[in-house]
């Protein structure tokens, strides 16, 4: 059986690993997952993300999680747009997460970017998830 929502699976794996105080989490890789992980590294929510090839044609994305004083850096990680109800917003309607303290992950025509970068570039897109 194929996975229907790979982004929700990724976010759930990260959330569960942080609740269990794991150092890292591994999952099947895809271009979308890698782009989201790179954005989370850039924004400082995770320590690192790297793709390793297992030789059988399947790549694995390994994410090293971040903690501050024993608590996970990511307090909230939530899927917003989902396969059954896509959420698209124009450049002026991109939501701010926790009054700018969090980040909304936006899929635009220029690739995956944060809400701040999308507003600065003047483009809207699909609001994938919220992280704070």
Curated annotation (Swiss-Prot):
Question: Subunit structure of this entry?
Answer: Part of the 30S ribosomal subunit. Contacts proteins S5 and S12.
What does the entry list under GO cellular component?
ribonucleoprotein complex; ribosome
Protein name, as recorded: Small ribosomal subunit protein uS8
* Keyword terms, alphabetized: Ribonucleoprotein, Ribosomal protein, RNA-binding, rRNA-binding
What Pfam families does the annotation carry? Answer: Ribosomal_S8 (PF00410)
The record, for InterPro entries, names:
Ribosomal_uS8, Ribosomal_uS8_CS, Ribosomal_uS8_sf
**GO BP, sorted A to Z:** translation
Q: Could you name the domain of life of the organism this protein comes from? A: Bacteria
Protein's job: One of the primary rRNA binding proteins, it binds directly to 16S rRNA central domain where it helps coordinate assembly of the platform of the 30S subunit.
What family does the entry list? Belongs to the universal ribosomal protein uS8 family.
What are the GO MF terms of this UniProt record? rRNA binding; structural constituent of ribosome
Listed as disulfide-bonded, the cysteine pairs are none
């Amino acid at each position: 059986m194929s996975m229907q929502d790979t982004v929700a699976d990724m976010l759930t794996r990260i959330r569960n690993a942080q609740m269990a105080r794991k150092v890292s989490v591994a999952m099947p890789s895809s271009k979308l997952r890698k782009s989201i992980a790179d954005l989370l590294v850039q924004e400082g929510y995770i320590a690192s993300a790297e793709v390793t090839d297992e030789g059988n044609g399947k790549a694995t994305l390994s994410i090293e999680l971040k903690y501050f004083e024993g608590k996970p850096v990511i307090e909230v990680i939530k899927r917003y747009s989902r396969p059954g109800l896509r959420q698209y917003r124009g450049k002026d309607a991109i939501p701010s997460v926790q009054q700018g303290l969090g980040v909304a992950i936006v899929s635009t025509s220029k690739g995956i970017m944060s809400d701040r970068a999308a507003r600065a570039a003047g483009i809207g897109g699909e609001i994938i998830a919220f992280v704070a």
